[in-house]
């Protein structure tokens, strides 16, 4: 998830084939961004890209009940994000308001319980992350985070229909 007018740089190796990329975040109208045209199809060939995956400066692990975040969490660099869980997982970084902790996201998380698959974006400013990775999947994301407090959150829904964040995949961290 990227903040309005923001940008992100993520690298992931994909098997050759046809892919569809779309956004399920809801717009103020209630429609998903995909309905409004935020959809793209692309093809991955077996030709190797000219650029290699960037070298990682730190590792972040996605596990079935949480995150293993680097310590200290770097301000700048490339994070290698690996899903070590048995389910698909993602990580979105959200900026916490000054003086707030996890409580800043709790009302939003409660609203997701038993709600539909489509959801409004979290009420905190996104600061980057990596979209859903299959078990064993790895991606890199370039980060440039100001000093401050953040949340790492996974909003992928599990077999019971609830977002993983409701089962422990939400964690605060500080960037110095």
Predicted regions and their residues:
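Surface-exposed interaction/gating patches
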Residues: 57-101, 133-148
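Extracytoplasmic beta-sandwich strand-turn segments characteristic of Greek-key/jelly-roll folds
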Residues: 1-14, 101-145, 171, 175
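A short tyrosine-centered beta-strand micro-motif
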Residues: 17-23, 145-154
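Extracytoplasmic entry segments of secretory-pathway proteins
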Residues: 1-64, 78, 129-133, 141
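Predominantly extracellular/luminal cell-surface or secreted proteins
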Residues: 24-26, 93-99, 153-157
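Extracytoplasmic/periplasmic copper-protein system
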Residues: 28-68, 72, 84, 98-124, ...
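Extended alpha-helical regions
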Residues: 123, 129, 151-153, 161
């Amino acid at each position: 998830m990227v903040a309005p007018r923001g940008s992100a740089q993520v690298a992931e190796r994909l098997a050759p084939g046809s892919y569809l990329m779309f956004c399920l975040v809801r717009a103020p109208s209630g429609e998903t961004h995909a309905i409004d045209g935020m959809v793209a199809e692309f093809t991955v060939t077996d030709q190797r890209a000219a650029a290699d995956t960037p070298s990682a400066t730190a590792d972040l692990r996605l596990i079935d009940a949480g995150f293993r975040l680097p310590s200290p969490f770097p301000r700048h660099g490339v994070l290698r994000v690996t899903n070590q869980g048995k389910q698909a997982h993602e990580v979105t970084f959200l900026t916490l308001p000054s003086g707030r902790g996890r409580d800043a996201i709790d009302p939003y998380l409660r609203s997701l319980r038993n709600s539909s698959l489509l959801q409004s974006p979290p009420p905190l400013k996104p600061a980057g992350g990596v979209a859903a990775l299959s078990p064993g999947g790895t991606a890199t994301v370039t980060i440039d985070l100001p000093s401050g407090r953040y949340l790492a959150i996974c909003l992928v829904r599990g077999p019971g229909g609830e977002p993983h964040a409701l089962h422990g995949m939400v964690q605060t961290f500080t960037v110095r």
